[in-house]
Each structure stands twice: as C-alpha cells, then as structure tokens.
C-alpha cells in the first residue's frame, strides 16, 4: 500500500505555512493531503494558524484569541517569508474547504487547544466539516486528547488521531479505547514494535514531522501509513520511486 504524503501546513518548506498559497502548492505537487491547525478568533471564527500568537508568521503581535476575524485578516501572513508572498492572509477553515472543494484530498485538522483553551471549538469544527461535506476526508488530531474525546462524543463517525511526542508503550491500546483512527507520533518513536502493534490492531500510523530524505526513506521502509512533512515534493518523488 502506498505511503500517504501529508503536507505539513501545506508546502511549508517553500511557501508561507498555513496559507492558501501553501495548500494550493501542496495540491499542485500531488500530495495526498495537508495538515493544518485551527484556533478561534475573539469573535468565534475558525482560523488556520499554528502558533497561539501571530508574532512569528505575520507582521502583527498578540494572541490569536484577542483578534476579531476582521482584525486578523488585516495581517500579512506572507511578508516574513519573502516579498513575493506579501499580501498572503491567515485563512479561515471555510476558505481552505472551498479551495479543496469536492476533490479526493485528505485534511488533517489539528485542534490547538493547550496553551490557550478554546471552549466550543470542537462544536464549531464539527459544524464546518458537516457543512462542507468533509466527513470522509478529515482526520481531527490534537495533543489535547480531552478535546478529541469530546469530538468523538459529539460526532462518533469522525476520524480522530492522537498526537504525542514521547515514547509511549503500546499506545494502540489507548487508540482503541478512544476509538481513534490513527496515532500521530513524533517520528523518532517509530520502531518495529509500534508499527507491528498498530497494524495488528487496525490503527493507522502518521509520524511527524519528517523532513530529511534519509528519515523519509526509513519511515517508508518501516511501513507507516502516511508521513507528515514540510517537504512534500521530496517525499512524493521518493514514494513514486518506491522509497
């Protein structure tokens, strides 16, 4: 079975992360899907940005939660990446869904609900997914497993993926207990026991964030189901060559 190529925040190696331009580029390259992050604005809109503050990726300063949608849309999310990307904006989740349309394309949505908690984000996300008919094309992931538990309670049919960083023992048991579709470990944790345990128990495995060619080759050889990477072009070429 082919290893899925999931572009982390889009083609974030070459284009400003979590922007429409980055997602469009990932689609043009032939990625199987994208990974993106959602947070809530002050007035309750789902916006796509990784950090809890806008400082690193835009020309603004402050917490995402303190901006209204109108205010956050005035920020330049491309200028720090280079002049040619000036004018890129922080997209809403709806705008990303509109870009993808009815294409057979995976969207891994990470709920950012840790440093800043966003009460009600799960309900808003589920509503957006249903509204745009993305139920079969999304995996909702988070480091906050309470948030994922809430998603599963409200929408049992949606796929969830458990994000984690440390070397957990037999984590597929936790995945099965939570009725999770997948595990999303930091790629250093990929060992034969983990791959075998997941395969035996029907749990998909999507390690992150794999950017070096030699690590991509190791992940493909290990037999993971998909790879989350900042460099989708290199990974696509490797997968096409058979690893």
Curated annotation (Swiss-Prot):
SUPFAM superfamilies: PLC-like phosphodiesterases
Result for mutant: residue 37 to A: Loss of activity
InterPro entries: GP_PDE_dom (IPR030395), PLC-like_Pdiesterase_TIM-brl (IPR017946)
Effect noted on mutating residue 50 to A: Retains 1.39% of activity
Any Pfam family hit: GDPD
Activity modulation notes: Inhibited by EDTA.
Catalysed transformations (reactions): a sn-glycero-3-phosphodiester + H2O = an alcohol + sn-glycerol 3-phosphate + H(+); sn-glycerol 3-phosphocholine + H2O = sn-glycerol 3-phosphate + choline + H(+)
Stored Gene3D superfamilies: Phosphatidylinositol (PI) phosphodiesterase
Ligand binding (Ca(2+)): 35, 37, 110
Annotated consequence of substituting residue 112 to A: Retains 4.7% of activity
Cofactor details (free text): Activity is higher with Mg(2+).
Record keywords, A-Z: Calcium, Hydrolase, Magnesium, Metal-binding
Family: Belongs to the glycerophosphoryl diester phosphodiesterase family.
Function statement: Glycerophosphodiester phosphodiesterase hydrolyzes glycerophosphodiesters into glycerol-3-phosphate (G3P) and the corresponding alcohol. Can use glycerophosphocholine.
Protein name: Glycerophosphodiester phosphodiesterase
Species this chain originates from: Caldanaerobacter subterraneus subsp. tengcongensis (strain DSM 15242 / JCM 11007 / NBRC 100824 / MB4)
């Amino acid at each position: 079975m082919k290893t899925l190529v999931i572009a982390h925040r889009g083609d974030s190696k070459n284009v400003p992360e979590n922007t429409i331009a980055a997602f469009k580029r990932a689609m043009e390259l032939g990625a199987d899907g994208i990974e993106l992050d959602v947070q809530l604005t002050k007035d309750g809109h789902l916006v796509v940005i990784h950090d809890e503050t806008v400082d690193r990726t835009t020309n603004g300063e402050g917490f995402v939660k303190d901006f209204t949608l109108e205010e956050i849309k005035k920020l330049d999310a491309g200028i720090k990446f280079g002049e040619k990307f000036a004018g890129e904006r922080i997209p809403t989740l709806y705008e990303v869904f509109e870009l993808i349309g009815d294409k057979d394309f995976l969207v891994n949505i990470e709920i950012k609900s840790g440093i800043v908690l966003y009460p009600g984000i799960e309900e808003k996300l589920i509503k957006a997914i249903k509204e745009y008919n993305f139920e079969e094309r999304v995996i909702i992931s988070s480091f906050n497993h309470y948030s994922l538990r809430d998603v599963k309670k409200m929408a049992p049919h949606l796929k969830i993926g458990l994000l984690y960083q440390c070397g957990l023992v037999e984590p597929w048991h936790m995945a099965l207990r939570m009725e999770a579709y997948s595990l999303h470990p930091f790629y250093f944790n990929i060992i034969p026991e983990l791959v075998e345990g997941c395969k035996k128990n029907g749990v998909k495995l999507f390690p992150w964030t794999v950017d070096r060619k030699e690590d991509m080759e190791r992940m493909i050889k290990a037999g993971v189901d998909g790879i989350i990477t900042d460099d989708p072009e290199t990974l696509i070429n490797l997968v096409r060559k058979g690893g």
